[in-house]
Amino acid sequence: MSANPFLDPAFHIRWSELAPEQVAPAIEAALAQAKGAVDAIAARDLGALTYANTFLALETATDALHLAWAKVTHLQSVADSPALRDAHNAMLPGVSAFSASIPLNAGLWIRLKAVAATVEARALTGIHRRFLDETVADFQQAGADLPAAARTRLEAIQTELAQITQKYSENVLDATNAWQLVVTEEARLAGLPAHAKAAARRGAEAKGLAGWRFTLHMPSVEPFMTYLADEALRRELWTASAAIGATAPQDNAPLIGRILTLRAEKAAVLNKAHFADLVLERRMAKTGARALAFMEDMEARAKGAFTRECQELEEFKAQQTGGEAARLAPWELLYWSEKLRQSRYDFDEEILRPYFPMDRVIAGLFELAGRVFGLRVVERGAQEVETWHPEVKFYDVRDGRGRHVGSFYADWYPRESKRGGAWMNYLITGGPRADGSRVPHLGLMCGNMTPPSEGKPALLKHREVETVFHEFGHLLHHLLGEVEIKSLNGVNVAWDFVELPSQIMENWAWERESLDLFARHHETGAAIPEEIFLKLTAAKNFRSACGTMRQVALAKMDLLMHMRTAEFAGEADVEGKARAAVANCLAPTEPAAPTVVKKFTHIFSDPVGYAAGYYSYKWAEVLDADAFTRFKREGIFNARVGAEFIETILSQGNATDPAELFRRFMGRDPDLQALLVRCGLAA
């Protein structure tokens, strides 16, 4: 056991001992060790090189650094504080510079190329052949063959990108937390669901305030904008939400321009036309043009229905208010959409909340994992395993043979110190080892779901249930990885393939058989009445073209900014330019709503992240809709199909080209038709 808990490799992490003042000594020590290991490989005698003492040695050279840094970055996501942020940011340049330097290390690259040309290397097969080829491709794509001056510039670009994208992320979090709305007149909360009202009351009490406190966190925003009758209050909250990342001192506009410029420069140094071509070169889409064409095809297919849906909403509001059909204000969209849904389907999503208590959803998810994938998930108590917050739970996962395949943490509720959204991540990549042993994986799932309130359990919206299933799909991809090479295991796959395991899991949240495993009224234990279930499924594609066009807008904005950077990076009004680029995909409102460009953390909070890759969500929808047809055809609880999905997809990581993995499961290439049918764009 290391004296510094950030350096302790133990499977059960000592979260209570991880203090900000320990970050610097831990990361400095881990960096020194990693640099020493890499330098040793780069200095090996050219006459004594082997695959083991170069490629395999490099694979493990940074293990300690990766684990220590993973603890730091994870804590900053779930338990941010000024001291932790300062400690993280002090170490960020050094960690980023070191990571960027590895593929640009001339001595290292000379030795890897030398080994790759040997008889030993040519004789490699299976995962070791894949690892050698992928490593060589990684180095070439990163610029290993460039002149020294170009390599030095690339290192500097990566370091600056790490710092600027971190600042972008901090601005979004700080702006989100800086705003609150306190309502003291209960009459103004007409229409607000009881759970949201109770949560707002609890939020006010926690701050020592009278009344009801609303924030810019999604569990507060969504019911407020969807149900609150008071338009003035909706406008006030919408205005604040639209300003996230757009006003001083958290204005992200200058950072966006610099991030885009640096990414474009990186692509140019690496002899690529633009950043999209650079990052997509080894993904399924291959080029920015192909990804853009895919999204434009989806746009064309959805355009007619999108226009009709927008007109229908305008006409519905006019009918209800006795006015003329006209553009809605952006703070009216969710409100009148919900009114239209209730009118058309006699269905209010809130009626489902009592059937989705979080604990039952989780239990049902685990039951599903047992039936389909042969897994057993067991919770470990707080007295057995430490976590970073009392709300966090810890679970062990065993497969059908009783093997401990891995464990995970689950952290589902919002806190001011926690970033928004939902995500899966990992701390330890296990799997088989060369000596025949097996190491368990360690992962985590986080979200910002509706929390418990006033003695009631956390009651989720159906969309939140989908999100839980989604993140669990990512988690299974990690926990079930059976690849000996850690960097090729689990979710370390092409970005436009990584969403397949997550998105396919969402399908079970729509099936009556699987819902019956867990969807029970938290007070009566009754299952969802058939009438309500039929209304849920009937309303599934309500305004689905608008949903599709929103995804198209985000993906096109992302791609266009990274393919035509000069048009955006030097633009004083980056918001106006971004809006103009995707105007045809945006719901028409008066006034026009700003885009999410200044709070688009998917593409601007990481040096790469989803940059030029947001299209991956829709790309993977094609894969998941098609793949789920096998379960629909052969049985949604069919354990044989589940075992095949593990064998061909979940266990394989990046052991094989993703298109080939899909073909192994489906017996053919992907078919778009299943997605078009599922989202109501085809019969």
Can you describe what each PLM-predicted range is?
Residues 1-25, 29, 190-191, 211-213, ...:
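C-terminal, non-catalytic "cap/extension" segments appended to globular domains
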Residues 30-37, 61-64, 68, 262, ...:
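Amphipathic, well-ordered alpha-helical segments in soluble domains
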Residues 131-132, 160-163, 170, 174-215, ...:
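Active-site-proximal, well-structured secondary-structure segments within enzyme catalytic domains
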Residues 225-227, 419-421, 455-459, 514-515, ...:
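Short conserved micro-motifs at the rims of enzyme active sites and ligand-binding pockets
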Residues 252-264, 439-445, 483, 652-654:
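Short, hydrophobic/aliphatic alpha-helical segments
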